[in-house]
């Protein structure tokens, strides 16, 4: 079988587990995809590392502070010429997707497209959190979902370094398994769950993650 034709590079790891017997965790779909969106944005700005170090990093921190994330900051990575940044929780990531003005830092059409990717992903994710999802809504989600992933990896048009070249967005290699699942399989899961009178948002590890966070915090509290 040619798995490439099915949108897969390799055979399924667990072919014995049918699609109807498992559900992706909606929390980690959001967390890991926002990690990709933020990473693509920050690393593009780090292409001019001197300018990033001199002013851009501070401006981004100020923008984060403007939307209420006053603890956000960049710090030098162990990888030379790179910076890491403060880890954000789910609520904070949703705040960034909704309110951070990407176009302040990436000008022109590219900045608008990048901001669209953030806002549209937020809209699609919030759809998954709705109580009542209709068949029509799932169909609309599926079309918008596929359009979103295609815009993410929109190719460069025109000859390299030519005046008419239109720079694309990100590489297909930047697409992660979570993004593949989001774009290619979530509508299928929505239909399966709807037929069973279940909701996608109920399949979330958010409560477990919160409990784990509290346990870790308590351990660290008594460590010092």
Residue ranges of model-derived segments:
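A structural signal for the principal folded core domain
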Residues: 1-224
């Amino acid at each position: 079988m040619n798995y490439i034709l099915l949108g897969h590079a390799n055979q399924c790891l667990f072919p014995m587990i049918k699609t109807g017997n498992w559900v992706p965790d909606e929390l980690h779909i959001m967390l890991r995809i926002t990690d990709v969106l933020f990473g693509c944005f920050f690393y593009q700005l780090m292409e001019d590392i001197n300018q990033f170090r001199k002013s851009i990093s501070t401006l981004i921190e100020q923008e984060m502070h403007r939307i209420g994330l006053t603890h956000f900051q960049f710090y030098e990575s162990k990888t030379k010429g790179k910076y890491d940044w403060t880890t954000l929780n789910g609520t904070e990531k949703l705040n960034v997707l909704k309110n951070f003005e990407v176009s302040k830092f990436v000008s022109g059409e590219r900045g608008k497209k990048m901001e669209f990717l953030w806002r549209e992903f937020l809209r699609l994710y919030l759809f998954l959190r709705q109580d009542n999802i209709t068949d029509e809504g799932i169909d609309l989600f599926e079309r918008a979902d596929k359009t979103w992933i295609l815009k993410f990896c929109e190719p460069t048009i025109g000859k390299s370094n030519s005046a008419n070249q239109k720079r694309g967005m990100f590489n297909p290699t930047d697409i992660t398994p979570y993004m593949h699942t989001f774009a290619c399989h979530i509508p299928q899961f929505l239909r399966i769950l709807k037929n069973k009178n279940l909701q996608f948002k109920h399949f979330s590890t958010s409560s477990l993650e919160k409990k784990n966070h509290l346990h870790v915090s308590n351990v660290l509290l008594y460590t010092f």
